[in-house]
Amino acid sequence: MAHYELHVLFVHSWMLALILITTLVWLAASQKAFTPDLVFPEMNRNSSWSVANYGEILCPTSFQSYDPKKHQILTRVLVERPSLNTDTKVEGYTCHKVKYETICDMPWYFSPTISHSISPLRVKESECKDAIAEHQLGTHVPLSFPPEDCSWNSVNTKEYEDIIVKEHPVMLDPYTNNYVDAIFPGGISSPGMGGTIHDDMMWVSKDLAVSPECSGWQRSMGLIYSSRLYGEREPMLEVGSIHIEGHRDKNLTLACRISFCGEIGVRFHDGEWMKVSVNLDHPNSVTFQVTDFPPCPPGTTIQTAVVENINPEIQELTVNMMYRLKCQETISKMVSGLPTSALDLSYLIQVQEGPGIVYKREKGILYQSVGMYQYIDTVTLNKEENQLGENSRGQKVFWTEWSDSPTRPGLQEGINGIVKYEGQVRVPLGMSLRLEAATELMWGHPVHTVSHPILHVISNHTEQSVTTWNRGVNSTNLIGLATRSISGFYDNLKLYLILALIFVSLIALVVLDVIPFKYILFVLCPPLLLCRFIKCSRRKPETRDRYHVEYNRPGQVSSAF
């Protein structure tokens, strides 16, 4: 019997446990996940309100990791971020200035020597610009050696000067915003037009008006919130974070300063670089100096947003920008004295948790106060009278202070553009979209590492000259020609004298009847045949066109014509 009662008790306990588990599961499933679609301030009943100064109203900067107990010092700043294109090649031109010379040396005996030479000349900036303009228009006519100008017993020189333009891209060092290439002295040149290691050559970027630089600068408002003061003498360790409107917060720990795109900025611990400066519209903010940060170690690299992968972020930024423009338009209306609506007032409100300005209108006058904004889920909007929704702690959120609208009967206005009409609370249109866009922007974006360019410097300066001597068919080496001509003349003269003496001797012998006339031919034939053989055996040396090139290059040359 006892065993049976124990078995029944066990079965009942098991059934009760199943019922309890099923109930808990059903209750959990019936609970909706917290999905905030509104930010609303918690207001103290004793909060003080003051009349707003339209000239001091600013569009909101949101907060992400603000801790009111820890972060008691706020510094409003301007943040600029570059989106560097991965192609750091800079298109440009090189200008070579050369002189073509043709020299004709004709002595008194009418035997000219013609030579051609190419010499480098120092090029001027104005000459290079004109030559590039002709090159771009296609009107440049390339020159060569001028025709010779020969006259008796003189040396005449004719010369042409020409500037040869060639396309020559170089690299851009985004850290210093300088050009990098082996043709520059030391491998580096400032933007625009620069000299090279050759005196006769200059490099010019394609766009003479604007120097290439990092593109796609994005300007945003930011806020540094920290736990203590900081200055040049205090290390920047755990002083707080910087919030950038539309982006994730960044901790200032391990941040350092480094030059990028020709600007001094801050590299954060995640590798991303930004230029940060104080917004002068807030003179009461803590003085912020980039020099407060220690310099980054040599060789430190940074990361920038990948241009081709930020389309989703651009979409969210577009939404943010649209509402920011509406905010600026609202402020402009107020300053100009134009009427504004409750919807216009909602554009002045931040969309992130943390401390911020709260606005309300009473009898046409705008008042402001300070409240602590929190996320609200409006799924229970108007479930009870004046209910806006629930916060992340599950607490119901209400607003009960309403004032009659001065422009529309039956409409009541609360704070931050919230209105009540026909007993129903109406939330400003677009608030949910703004919050969604801001939340999406809190996530990271793809980045790429920017490396330092590596270059092996060839030379700081190189002298170069090229001279070409051309001996053609109608031009000779005068000294050699004169020597050969005189030598040949005397050789022939000796032969003719010998033959003349032999001939005269034979005639004398015939006249004196020493040798009969019939033997004259027998005596003369051997010498004549011998002379003919000697003369024919002499061949003139072949003459060919010869070219000789002399190079004078004291240093190593990295480029040639």
UniProtKB/Swiss-Prot annotation:
> What's noted about post-translational modification?
Glycosylated by host.
Q: Where in the cell is it found?
A: Virion membrane; Host membrane
- Pfam hit, one: Rhabdo_glycop_CD
Instruction: From the Swiss-Prot or TrEMBL record, give the protein name.
Output: Glycoprotein
Task: Check the UniProt entry and state the signal peptide residues, or none.
Answer: 1-30
Gene Ontology CC terms, in alphabetical order: host cell membrane; membrane; viral envelope; virion membrane
The upper taxonomy is: Viruses, Riboviria, Orthornavirae, Negarnaviricota, Haploviricotina
Protein role: Attaches the virus to host receptors, inducing clathrin-dependent endocytosis of the virion.
- Grouped into one coarse class, the protein's main location is virion
**Keywords, in A-Z order:** Clathrin-mediated endocytosis of virus by host, Disulfide bond, Fusion of virus membrane with host endosomal membrane, Fusion of virus membrane with host membrane, Glycoprotein, Host membrane, Host-virus interaction, Lipoprotein, Membrane, Palmitate, Signal, Transmembrane, Transmembrane helix, Viral attachment to host cell, Viral envelope protein, Viral penetration into host cytoplasm, Virion, Virus endocytosis by host, Virus entry into host cell
